[in-house]
Design a protein with these regions (language model features):
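N-terminal cap/lid segment of alpha/beta-hydrolase-fold proteins
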Residues: 1-52, 141
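Short beta-strand element of the alpha/beta-hydrolase
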Residues: 54-63, 176
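Glycine-rich His-Gly loop
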Residues: 60-64, 163, 180-181
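Serine-hydrolase catalytic-loop signature spanning alpha/beta hydrolases and amidase-signature enzymes
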Residues: 64-67, 88, 108
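Short amphipathic alpha-helix adjacent to the substrate-entry channel of hydrolases
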Residues: 70-89
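Primarily recognizes the serine-hydrolase "nucleophile elbow" in alpha/beta-hydrolase
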Residues: 100, 104-172
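Short beta-strand/loop motif that positions the catalytic acidic residue
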Residues: 171, 176-179, 183
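Short alpha-helix in the alpha/beta-hydrolase fold that links the catalytic acid
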Residues: 173, 187-194
């Protein structure tokens, strides 16, 4: 985990500019839900706007389910994808309930697609480390249905980086996975099995 100063400044400047034009952070829980469970307070989606009605991506950052490394692990990817015309969201999740929060984020975007001007039927789930596990897990159709029901389509793709998640199922979305041969977090041999 490494913060690139110039990239971080570029991201903050972009969010500042966008924040003057449109909403850049969407809480995914209602005020009533937050009153009942204050841990939901800062949970939500940063929005990097792409083209109107283009597909969207949700980025789930790593942090070993100990912290949320959005600035260095998700924001750079979201910025790049939005500059290519795709709508990109970065999920700020609770480390105690990451899968619940990702499912809620998917539902939130699906339910608010008209307001957000995104194509609700075409999306991808991205993640690094712990976030990759989240993306792969909710990219599985059976798991997705168990969280959100049958109304929301499965993601078109899952993009996973540096995680040892090696479960495979016929219900998984098409998946791209990458790790480095010198990665100290995960053994590359684990991913070859996937």
């Amino acid at each position: 985990s490494c913060i690139q100063v110039s990239q971080t400044i570029k991201i903050i400047q972009k969010l500042n500019e966008d924040g003057q034009k449109h909403t850049i952070f969407y809480p995914i829980y209602s005020k009533t839900e937050i009153m009942k469970d204050p841990s939901k307070k800062d949970t939500g989606l940063f929005f990097f706007k792409g083209n109107d009605n283009a597909p969207f991506a949700i980025f789930n950052e790593g942090g070993g389910f100990m912290y949320v490394g959005a600035m260095h692990d998700s924001f750079p990817h979201a910025l790049e994808l939005s500059q290519r015309g795709y709508n990109a969201f970065v999920l700020i999740y609770r480390v105690s309930h990451p899968y619940v929060d990702l499912a809620r984020a998917i539902s939130f975007i699906y339910d608010h697609a008209s307001l957000l001007k995104v194509d609700k039927n075409h999306y991808s789930l991205w993640g690094g480390s712990a976030g990759a596990r989240m993306a792969a897990t909710l990219g599985n159709k059976k798991v997705l249905v168990s969280y959100v029901g049958n109304d929301i389509p499965q993601s078109d793709a899952v993009i996973m980086q540096y995680t040892g998640y090696n479960h495979i199922s016929l219900y998984d979305a098409p998946t791209y996975a990458c790790v480095g041969s010198d990665d100290y977090i995960v053994d590359a041999a684990d991913m070859k099995k996937r």
